[in-house]
């Protein structure tokens, strides 16, 4: 059986942690910052973990 290929769009958006969880960045961070509060912008800077339902789909696209 051939090797699984990595889905490159997924690889650019997600990173696996050492324990096997998947990290993601927040949406709404490219423009229109004047309409967002300082607190909201600060929280958007931090990375988040992928939810368990999405993890099942993403893990097949990131074979490594």
UniProtKB/Swiss-Prot annotation:
Composition skew (Basic residues), residue ranges: 1-26
Residue segments, region Disordered: 1-64
MF terms (GO), sorted A to Z: structural constituent of ribosome
One matching Pfam family: Ribosomal_L35p
A biological process from GO: translation
CC terms in the record's Gene Ontology section: cytosolic large ribosomal subunit
Tagged with keyword Ribonucleoprotein: yes
Keywords of this entry: Ribonucleoprotein, Ribosomal protein
Biased composition range(s): Basic and acidic residues: 54-64
PANTHER family in the record: 54S RIBOSOMAL PROTEIN BL35M, LARGE RIBOSOMAL SUBUNIT PROTEIN BL35M
NCBIfam families: rpmI_bact
Family note: Belongs to the bacterial ribosomal protein bL35 family.
Protein name: Large ribosomal subunit protein bL35
Organism lineage: Bacteria, Bacillati, Bacillota, Bacilli, Bacillales
């Amino acid at each position: 059986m051939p090797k699984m290929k990595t889905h490159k769009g997924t690889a650019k958006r997600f990173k696996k942690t050492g324990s096997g969880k998947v990290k993601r960045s927040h949406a709404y961070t490219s423009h229109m910052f004047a309409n967002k509060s300082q607190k909201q912008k600060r929280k958007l800077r931090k990375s988040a973990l992928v939810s368990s339902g999405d993890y099942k789909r993403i893990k097949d696209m990131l074979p490594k």
